[in-house]
């Protein structure tokens, strides 16, 4: 039991004013083993400090995502070492496990294998400090997991949705298909006409089965957990500013577990360079 012997050696050194060499010989413990703990603590000090600082800023991140960010910063570490410090510092959060429901006969779209092959789109609701409800149009690329836009307003009709899609298309091109639910904004004539004019296929999921639009549903969960629930929006403009800041961070900085803990924008760039 080296840990116990190290403690005894330290006690003997102090209590009997004995040298380290004599105390180690008396207890049958090598001096290298005795010093190991001190060196280990010294090696961990910088990593521990950075981990605590990062965890304070990224309160909803677990140790694996924090590990990815530390590695990206150039710190020599691995997930086991980070997990040990994560537990020692009491940074682990209790997460309520959600009940997973498996839908029988669920029809899901094939996984996208290239950018703009298939987008996923949905609407999310929240409110500002005055109690006024705000709506968010969320869009995710099924291949790169990038979020090209989160449109925030008090109402978002079909005409507004098509304008947002045209704006995104002017920057990155049109998708081949969009997966979406059966909400009135998406079943509108305006969006139907847009899809025919642009040659974009609309793939509507079955009513009451959001699992068929899993990519955007997962994204919406992260949006709510890391942004909506973590912020107090004083006004519509304040909500727009904070949500856009979160979107930029999601695309550019946040490690994505489905992309081997690489941020979506970096994944998209690397993919484009490999295909060039």
Predicted feature locations:
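Charged DNA-binding/catalytic regions of mobile-element recombinases
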Residues: 1-276
């Amino acid at each position: 039991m080296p840990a116990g012997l190290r403690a005894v050696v330290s006690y003997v050194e102090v209590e009997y004013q004995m040298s380290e060499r004599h105390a180690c010989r008396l207890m049958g413990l090598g001096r290298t083993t005795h010093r190991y703990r001190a060196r280990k603590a010294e090696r961990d000090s910088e990593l521990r400090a950075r981990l605590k600082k990062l965890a304070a800023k990224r309160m909803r991140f677990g140790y694996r995502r924090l590990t990815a960010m530390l590695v990206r910063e150039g710190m020599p570490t691995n997930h086991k070492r980070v997990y040990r410090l994560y537990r020692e510092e009491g940074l682990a959060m209790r997460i309520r496990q959600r009940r997973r429901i498996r839908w029988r006969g669920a029809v899901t779209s094939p996984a996208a294998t290239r950018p703009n092959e298939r987008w996923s789109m949905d609407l999310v609701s929240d409110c500002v400090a005055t109690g006024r409800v705000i709506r968010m149009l969320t869009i995710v690329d099924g291949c790169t997991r990038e979020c090209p836009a989160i449109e925030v307003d008090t109402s978002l009709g079909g005409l507004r949705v098509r304008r947002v899609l045209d704006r995104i298309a002017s920057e990155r091109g049109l998708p081949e298909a969009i997966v979406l639910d059966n909400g009135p904004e998406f079943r509108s004539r305006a969006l139907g006409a847009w899809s025919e004019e642009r040659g974009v296929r609309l793939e509507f999921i079955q009513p009451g089965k959001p699992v068929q639009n899993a990519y955007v549903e997962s994204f919406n969960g992260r949006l709510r957990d890391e942004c909506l629930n973590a912020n107090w929006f004083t006004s519509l403009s304040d909500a727009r500013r904070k949500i856009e800041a979160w979107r930029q961070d999601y695309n550019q900085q946040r490690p994505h577990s489905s992309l081997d803990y690489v941020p979506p924008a970096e994944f998209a760039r690397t993919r484009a360079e490999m295909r060039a």
